[in-house]
Every structure is written in C-alpha cells, then in structure tokens.
Amino acid sequence: MGNFIRKLPGLRAWAQVDLGAVIHNFDEAKAKIAPDMRLLAVVKADAYGHGATEVAHALESRADMFAVATAEEALELRQDGIKGDILILGYAPDDSFDDLIENDITPTVDTLEEAYELNDTAERFGRRAKAHIALDTGMSRIGFCANEEGIAQIKEVCALPNIDVRGIFSHFSTADEEDKSFSLLQKERFSSVCAALAAAGINIPIKHLSNSAGIVDLPPCFDMARAGIILYGLYPSDEVERSMKLKPALSLYAKVNFLKEIDEGTAVGYGRTFVANKKTRVATLCAGYADGIPRMIARDGYVLLCGKRAKIIGRVCMDQMMIDVTDIPDVKIGSVATIIGRDGKEEITADEFARWAGTISYEILCGISKRVPRLYDKTK
C-alpha cells in the first residue's frame, strides 16, 4: 500500500489502482498472441471497476482498440479524450446511432433490422458507419447464427452501401474450463462462416474470437484477441494454466472507525448472527454492501489488519462491517484494513474474496461502488 494513501484526509474506504500493473498485464497478453495479431483492451463496466478513462489513457499507445458494453460507455471515453478505435460489444439502441457515427464509434450489428437502421442513419450523415458483426457459435447470447441462414444475412449486411464492416467476432463460452472441446468446436464454426464469406468475395478485415481465457489457454487465432480480466491481473478461472506473470491492479481498503470490547454472550450485528463466546475486541470498518462488500462474505471472510488476518463477524451492514481484532492489539481508530490486496506477508486476492462470497472475481471488481474513490498509482 502506497504511503501517500495514509496521508490523504477524509477517506473512509477507497480502491488503489496500479496502472503500471495494467500496462504490465497488457504486455504479458501481447506476448502470448501471434506477433501479427492485434490486441483489444476490454474496458467495459468502468474497466471492471478500475476506471475506464484512466485505464484507456494508460493503454492508449499500446491497445489496437478498446471495447465497451454500451453506447454510454463509449461516448464517455470519447468525451474524456480517448482517440483510439472504440467497439461496443453489446447492444446499442437505434437512437444512439447518430452520436456513434458522429463520434466515430463502432457498434456491433447482430440483426438485419439493426443493420438497416444503422445504414439509414449513416446515409443521413453522408458517411459510412463502421460496424463489427456478432456471430453466435455456441454462446446463445447475441449474434447471427453460424448456419446458412446466418451467412446469407451477413452477406446482406455487407452489401449495404453505408456500412463499413470492419470486423466479425464470436465469444468462447467455455475456454476457461479444462475441457477445450467445445471451444475448438466454436473455433471451427467461426472459421467455417469466415470461409463461406471469403468464397463469396467478402473478406472482413478483423476476425476475433479469443477472450482472456483463449489468450491464456488456446493457440493464437485470427486477427485480434480481446484481453479482459487478465488486464487487471486476474485469471479467468482456476482451471486455466498460470504461466503468465500477471499483477493484480486493484487493492481495496477501509479505515477502522470504532473499537470496543464486548463480553461473552454479546451479539454483533443485524439478526444477532454472531455471539461472542469470550471477551472479544471488535473493530468497525467504514465499508459495507453499499460499497461493494457482499453480505454473504461474513460467513467465511477475513480482512487484513497490521499484517494479520482478522475475521469478519456479524452481518455486513450497508455502510459498515465488524471485525474480530482480539488477537491484534495494535489496531486503533484510523487503522487501515486491507479488504483486497497485500499487507506485509499476508494477501487477500480478489479470487479468494470472491470464493468467500460464492461468486467470481469479475463480479466483485465490478461491484465496487462509485462512492468508493479510485486512487491511481501511475508508475510502472
């Protein structure tokens, strides 16, 4: 934890983001793909809770493209000065097309109706709108089907005069699992559709299929890969190999705002779910579920205080949580607890934190709320 954090007044809970780690992780991902492949940085959901604008600025000289989930996320990046290519991976409503075309943002097209609406909007502007085509190879989420009907529809999209189809992509649904058989089937389906389009004289310049799990665990394929969770120093699952030297980029902290000693038999928190079986010293932290700490975590979870693990007790409240610090006498009002991150020789990773909450690291990071300030360390 940077010493400068301790000197900042008025903070109750905060996240520290190491942009140098993000840059390092991007370079690690780049080294895993083929030299002639492009690498896209996924910064959707506020860069998985790390801050999309700050992450994009840090990677702007490296990333070939940025990806977001919504039109609002894309426009915010443009307004904050990001000049690189921005792809919207998810749904963009028709009434956003004017702004997207005007700001040179690339939407995803996954239906004919959407394509015709984008084409008509571009015609009004006197421009050709960029687009990527989504292909469903087995995720069953969005995209044209990987069959004859889907191929015919994609050909129709590519024939529209005011759409410049720059890319086509699909998404691995099980690449983070040990069994890669379905991922290989998805790759085969994707290749087959691209080959059928090429046979019809349609050569879409950027084909991309690999997500973070694909980058980590599968051979490089096609023209571009999409780095998501690995940018932030975390692996997609426990089932992928761990040969990359990833650095977690986010740490989460909260201050101790209250200390008291309770007697045996005294209950702590809502529902009286914890009852002390001995005299217990309790610290209250300034972080709760409104900050992104799941209520579920109280059963198994810990924080770090003074370089030691301290058990969460009682239910996590909206704005506070209670910790057993009986065996950590150095804790005082204003002490800083590490919720995710390292303190001395001890570390709580986002993955461990997520296991306590019965979820995945992605959800934990994205769930850290807006009221938690993000502080940035830009050294590499």
Locate predicted features.
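Class I S-adenosylmethionine-dependent transferase superfamily signal
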Residues: 29
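Active-site-proximal beta-alpha core segment in soluble small-molecule metabolic enzymes
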Residues: 2-4, 9, 13-16, 23-24, ...
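Conserved PLP-enzyme active-site core in the AAT-like
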Residues: 32
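Active-site anion/phosphate-binding pocket segments in diverse small-molecule metabolic enzymes
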Residues: 2-23, 73, 92-94, 99, ...
